[in-house]
């Protein structure tokens, strides 16, 4: 989860988020090299007295500054496309959960279980217990088994919402009348926090998401207790 004065990403807990972190580092390296080159050229122009007033054209230079940016864009686009296709892949999900956005709470339905559904509201600040996080705790957490592929079907009952959990690399729009889907796979147990990431009204800031990822045997006990 995030912590005060954090400058980087949250720790990755899914294969997709790990790939996104690698892609971020790859792109940042390219941006750093380009910025260094531009700063060097600017400083050289400001500090040297040499000029080329007689130069009418420079085919070699024009060729280089056309081909080099194209190569750089390709080195950025190829890994990006790979991750986009990975995010769209859904291979034999262990279960399906339907998520509906409302003003201003989330509702969840475990479609593989009979009558296993609930609403998830933010816990008011006045009701928080010691150690709980303000504006991030909910009355009903989404409990999921660890190391199992989960398909999330996401939509909305009223206005645009967005279901986002940064540490899992997830952000999917909840659109009224449209059903979006994404996959979720956590490689370690724990609590993972997210929030609605699409402005949806006056209480947009009070739509937290809490995923509780547990071993399979604990998930089975929880699902039995909820039925």
UniProtKB/Swiss-Prot annotation:
Residues at which Cu cation A2 binds = 196, 198, 200, 204
Q: Which cofactor does it need?
A: Cu cation
Q: Which positions bind Cu cation A1?
A: 161, 196, 200, 207
Which GO BP terms apply? ATP synthesis coupled electron transport
Family matches, as InterPro entries: CcO_II (IPR045187), CcO_II-like_C (IPR002429), CcO_II_C (IPR034210), Copper_CuA (IPR001505), Cupredoxin (IPR008972), Cyt_c_oxidase_su2 (IPR014222), Cyt_c_oxidase_su2_TM_dom (IPR011759), Cyt_c_oxidase_su2_TM_sf (IPR036257)
Q: List locations, semicolon-separated.
A: Mitochondrion inner membrane
Where, per the database record, does this protein carry Phosphotyrosine?
218
Q: Which residue pairs form cystines in this protein?
A: none
Cofactor binding notes: Binds a dinuclear copper A center per subunit.
Give the reactions, separated by semicolons, that this protein catalyses.
4 Fe(II)-[cytochrome c] + O2 + 8 H(+)(in) = 4 Fe(III)-[cytochrome c] + 2 H2O + 4 H(+)(out)
Known partners and oligomeric status: Component of the cytochrome c oxidase (complex IV, CIV), a multisubunit enzyme composed of 14 subunits. The complex is composed of a catalytic core of 3 subunits MT-CO1, MT-CO2 and MT-CO3, encoded in the mitochondrial DNA, and 11 supernumerary subunits COX4I, COX5A, COX5B, COX6A, COX6B, COX6C, COX7A, COX7B, COX7C, COX8 and NDUFA4, which are encoded in the nuclear genome.
Name the record gives this protein: Cytochrome c oxidase subunit 2
